[in-house]
């Protein structure tokens, strides 16, 4: 199974790239973690946010291979504990499809992305910086994988 992280934003600080790549490299070949970056729309004083969201959404959906299971990372989504995430990852694996996780820009995800998602996952009720979310998601997925594979990374 491949897990594709589709995220708005292309110029991340070095610590974000380093953190994401650290967890990405830990995954085994049969469960690859891939990052697809979508250019953020230009936001200015008089920017048309609805139009920016629509364009970002179109680019995100175009980046997802047909047949992928789509999960939005969004505030009204479901909060998962680490064991619940591990269980969800097992379900995705049994489903036999690759998974695309969507991380929106500063204003979130477009309505089209939310509609296309079969599931919605909420990391926190807190507002998190979008660059940090990439690292948190990568670590959380790796921790879920480690539980499912009896790897000593996760401890109760």
UniProtKB/Swiss-Prot annotation:
Keywords (A to Z) from UniProt: Cytoplasm, Methyltransferase, rRNA processing, S-adenosyl-L-methionine, Transferase
Class in the EC hierarchy, top level: transferase
Binding site for S-adenosyl-L-methionine: 73, 104, 123-128
Keyword Methyltransferase on entry: yes
Record localization: Cytoplasm
GO CC term (a single one): cytoplasm
Reactions listed under catalytic activity: pseudouridine(1915) in 23S rRNA + S-adenosyl-L-methionine = N(3)-methylpseudouridine(1915) in 23S rRNA + S-adenosyl-L-homocysteine + H(+)
Stored InterPro entries: Alpha/beta_knot_MTases (IPR029028), RlmH-like (IPR003742), tRNA_m1G_MTases_N (IPR029026)
CDD domains (alphabetical): RlmH-like
Molecular function, one GO term: rRNA (pseudouridine-N3-)-methyltransferase activity
Catalytic activity, EC: 2.1.1.177
Superkingdom classification of source: Bacteria
Pfam family name, one: SPOUT_MTase
Residue ranges the record marks as coiled coil: none
Chain's role: Specifically methylates the pseudouridine at position 1915 (m3Psi1915) in 23S rRNA.
Family statement: Belongs to the RNA methyltransferase RlmH family.
Assembly information from the UniProt record: Homodimer.
Name used for this protein in its record: Ribosomal RNA large subunit methyltransferase H
Organism of derivation: Shewanella pealeana (strain ATCC 700345 / ANG-SQ1)
Source taxonomy: Bacteria, Pseudomonadati, Pseudomonadota, Gammaproteobacteria, Alteromonadales
């Amino acid at each position: 199974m491949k897990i594709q992280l589709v995220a708005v934003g292309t110029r991340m600080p070095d610590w974000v790239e380093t953190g994401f790549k650290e967890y990405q490299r830990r995954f085994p070949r049969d469960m690859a973690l891939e990052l697809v970056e979508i250019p953020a729309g230009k936001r200015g004083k008089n920017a048309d946010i609805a139009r920016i969201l629509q364009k970002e959404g179109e680019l995100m959906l175009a980046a997802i291979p047909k047949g992928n299971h789509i999960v939005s990372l969004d505030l009204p989504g479901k909060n998962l504990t680490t064991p619940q995430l591990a269980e969800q990852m097992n379900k995705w694996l049994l489903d036999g499809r690759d998974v695309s996780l969507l991380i929106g820009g500063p204003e979130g995800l477009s309505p089209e992305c939310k509609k296309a998602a079969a599931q919605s996952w909420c990391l926190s009720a807190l507002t998190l910086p979008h660059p940090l979310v990439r690292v948190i998601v990568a670590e959380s997925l790796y921790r879920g994988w480690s539980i499912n594979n009896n790897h000593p990374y996760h401890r109760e």
